[in-house]
Amino acid sequence: MTTPSDLNIYQLIDTQNGRVTPRIYTDPDIYQLELERIFGRCWLFLAHESQIPKPGDFFNTYMGEDAVVVVRQKDGSIKAFLNQCRHRAMRVSYADCGNSRAFTCPYHGWSYGINGELIDVPLEPRAYPQGLCKSHWGLNEVPCVESYKGLIFGNWDTSAPGLHDYLGDIAWYLDGMLDRREGGTEIVGGVQKWVINCNWKFPAEQFASDQYHALFSHASAVQVLGAKDDGSDKRLGDGQTARPVWETAKDALQFGQDGHGSGFFFTEKPDANVWVDGAVSSYYRETYAEAEQRLGEVRALRLAGHNNIFPTLSWLNGTATLRVWHPRGPDQVEVWAFCITDKAASDEVKAAFENSATRAFGPAGFLEQDDSENWCEIQKLLKGHRARNSKLCLEMGLGQEKRRDDGIPGITNYIFSETAARGMYQRWADLLSSESWQEVLDKTAAYQQEVMK
């Protein structure tokens, strides 16, 4: 059995000097350890409460590579279970979502209530004449399930910090999407799913820390949608905001703490997002006053940038895309993309949000394709022995971290930096090399204290 010491995790990651060895993206032993110590110990996004509003409503998803079913209970609470029959490990729920009074295994017919209890075993008196203790063979329940403003998270590790503590200061940035209007948010439409042939850490890192790539990877989109020489805007539709935000922003920052990351520009108008269409742009202008009252000016104006909650929940504020990077081996990730909107928005605006999110960041989105091509090409190159063992530079903004005095929380830097990436890989290494959550927290705290010296 491979142990963390065998893998020399801290020799692969040197966050103090900004170095990473790309073998972390290819090694199957590292990947198996990730499934155990990251996806088995961290809070993972499961679903949005709007997807399971009534008792018996369920949504099927994954925690790492473990299939789980999330179910609204009769009392309104939410439970999640391993989607696996306790008889021969068969899946008990196949539909992506729906409403059910029970989950029945198609193999031998064992049936479970929505509370996870085993309620029926076919031919039980004949098959188990000695008796069967059904109370012992209910579905394996995810022991920790909590919600944050509509987002449902699960955790297998009962010793982990609670969800509120786990989120920490990233919650302030997350509220900029979840708390703009009275009534909160909801998921619009279904889930778009596709597979990218790359390690899950590539997209997670980019959404945590990388605004820098947009100037180059998305150059063609910026040229099409960007400002004309005469200063007027090109438009995809009525009200389309087109000028690149990094040209117009008065300030910008990146947040990186506890493995989480966020970055955004301080804009001066409530529709400063090049990737949204006219109806969405107008909606942001019309609802700005309410958002400012609830969030303050900085977050109310924040409609561009990047975000990731460690390990795999990412979102983009202005384009209303929320996505999860489900790992599928060391060289593959399955993307699940949701459109998240204010619940109070009109049906017309919600449809416009969905169109904008799909156009830019759907599986064939004009920005999504740029990103996917980058990640896939890197993964191909890392098949080479020398390539996957040659250290990479992670020095951008090294030593420039600070805490702001304007009420914006956490460890920050200028937006074009890798503060959040270094923090993400530090938390990653701490989790892989630690036996307990307390050890993880102590190591991360020591790293962050050193960063702020």
Swiss-Prot record:
<feature type="binding site">
    <location>
        <position position="218"/>
    </location>
    <ligand>
        <name>Fe cation</name>
    </ligand>
</feature>
<comment type="function">
    <text>Part of the multicomponent 3-phenylpropionate dioxygenase. Converts 3-phenylpropionic acid (PP) and cinnamic acid (CI) into 3-phenylpropionate-dihydrodiol (PP-dihydrodiol) and cinnamic acid-dihydrodiol (CI-dihydrodiol), respectively.</text>
</comment>
<dbReference type="InterPro" id="IPR001663">
    <property type="entry name" value="Rng_hydr_dOase-A"/>
</dbReference>
<keyword id="KW-0520">NAD</keyword>
<dbReference type="InterPro" id="IPR054883">
    <property type="entry name" value="3PPDioc_HcaE"/>
</dbReference>
<feature type="binding site">
    <location>
        <position position="108"/>
    </location>
    <ligand>
        <name>[2Fe-2S] cluster</name>
    </ligand>
</feature>
<protein>
    <recommendedName>
        <fullName>3-phenylpropionate/cinnamic acid dioxygenase subunit alpha</fullName>
        <ecNumber>1.14.12.19</ecNumber>
    </recommendedName>
</protein>
<feature type="binding site">
    <location>
        <position position="105"/>
    </location>
    <ligand>
        <name>[2Fe-2S] cluster</name>
    </ligand>
</feature>
<dbReference type="InterPro" id="IPR015881">
    <property type="entry name" value="Ring-hydroxy_dOase_2Fe2S_BS"/>
</dbReference>
<comment type="subunit">
    <text>This dioxygenase system consists of four proteins: the two subunits of the hydroxylase component (HcaE and HcaF), a ferredoxin (HcaC) and a ferredoxin reductase (HcaD).</text>
</comment>
<dbReference type="GO" id="GO:0008695">
    <property type="term" value="F:3-phenylpropionate dioxygenase activity"/>
</dbReference>
<dbReference type="InterPro" id="IPR043266">
    <property type="entry name" value="RHO_NdoB-like_C"/>
</dbReference>
<dbReference type="GO" id="GO:0019380">
    <property type="term" value="P:3-phenylpropionate catabolic process"/>
</dbReference>
<keyword id="KW-0479">Metal-binding</keyword>
<feature type="binding site">
    <location>
        <position position="87"/>
    </location>
    <ligand>
        <name>[2Fe-2S] cluster</name>
    </ligand>
</feature>
<feature type="domain" description="Rieske">
    <location>
        <begin position="44"/>
        <end position="142"/>
    </location>
</feature>
<keyword id="KW-0411">Iron-sulfur</keyword>
<keyword id="KW-0223">Dioxygenase</keyword>
<dbReference type="InterPro" id="IPR017941">
    <property type="entry name" value="Rieske_2Fe-2S"/>
</dbReference>
<dbReference type="InterPro" id="IPR036922">
    <property type="entry name" value="Rieske_2Fe-2S_sf"/>
</dbReference>
<dbReference type="GO" id="GO:0051537">
    <property type="term" value="F:2 iron, 2 sulfur cluster binding"/>
</dbReference>
<keyword id="KW-0408">Iron</keyword>
<keyword id="KW-0001">2Fe-2S</keyword>
<dbReference type="InterPro" id="IPR020875">
    <property type="entry name" value="HcaE"/>
</dbReference>
<comment type="similarity">
    <text>Belongs to the bacterial ring-hydroxylating dioxygenase alpha subunit family.</text>
</comment>
<dbReference type="Pfam" id="PF00355">
    <property type="entry name" value="Rieske"/>
</dbReference>
<comment type="pathway">
    <text>Aromatic compound metabolism; 3-phenylpropanoate degradation.</text>
</comment>
<keyword id="KW-0560">Oxidoreductase</keyword>
<dbReference type="GO" id="GO:0005506">
    <property type="term" value="F:iron ion binding"/>
</dbReference>
<dbReference type="Pfam" id="PF00848">
    <property type="entry name" value="Ring_hydroxyl_A"/>
</dbReference>
<keyword id="KW-0058">Aromatic hydrocarbons catabolism</keyword>
<feature type="binding site">
    <location>
        <position position="213"/>
    </location>
    <ligand>
        <name>Fe cation</name>
    </ligand>
</feature>
<feature type="binding site">
    <location>
        <position position="85"/>
    </location>
    <ligand>
        <name>[2Fe-2S] cluster</name>
    </ligand>
</feature>
<dbReference type="InterPro" id="IPR015879">
    <property type="entry name" value="Ring_hydroxy_dOase_asu_C_dom"/>
</dbReference>
